[in-house]
């Protein structure tokens, strides 16, 4: 029987507090925008299936992390078991962009010996008139770290699907090439799920009769 999903990828969404991590995830997983969103305390969990090719689905397990310093010791524990991540900054908040380097360095320390595929996300692009970070400098920073760059808006649903699906496809290609593998004790990538098939007693009897012929 065909698998419900081919692989499960665990993703983590990181960045400073108030950059809009929870809003972006809820727009992607629930299709809605929350005008008022309470700060994440520790870590929240979401999931969604994504079809990357016809008939090929990936289950995304998405961890929404708190950006406040007092919760960092909790969120660091989730780095190691993630295979991919969105690193968010707010295009209207230059400080959140300047802190991208710090987030990447922290992740690098705690993810060993595994790797995380990141996409850099400039969020709140609907507020372009208040922009404090140019697209050019964001693209330059992303290139320096070997990341893709994309600008999104949870409020206006701009590039939200693309951010998650592009990241998923990048990870999938690495898995297909054998550069990322399923490993015991690591939750980043898991193999697909095939549901158990319960046969009726009549079907079992017919099968047994065929075997006796």
UniProtKB/Swiss-Prot annotation:
Mg(2+) binds at residues 22, 40, 64. Regulated by guanine nucleotide exchange factors (GEFs) including C9orf72-SMCR8 complex, which promote the exchange of bound GDP for free GTP. Regulated by GTPase activating proteins (GAPs) which increase the GTP hydrolysis activity. Inhibited by GDP dissociation inhibitors (GDIs). It is a lipid-anchor. Residues 35-43 are annotated as: Switch-I. Its main location: membrane. Pfam families: Ras. Specifically expressed in neuron and neuronal precursors in the brain. Expression is high in all regions of the brain with highest levels observed in the hippocampus. The modification Cysteine methyl ester is found at residue 213. The keyword RNA-binding does not apply. It is found in: Cell membrane; Cytoplasmic vesicle membrane; Golgi apparatus; Cytoplasmic vesicle, Autophagosome membrane. GO terms for biological process: autophagy; protein transport; Rab protein signal transduction; regulation of autophagy; synapse organization; vesicle-mediated transport. Belongs to the small GTPase superfamily. Rab family. Switch I, switch II and the interswitch regions are characteristic of Rab GTPases and mediate the interactions with Rab downstream effectors. The switch regions undergo conformational changes upon nucleotide binding which drive interaction with specific sets of effector proteins, with most effectors only binding to GTP-bound Rab. This is Ras-related protein Rab-39B.
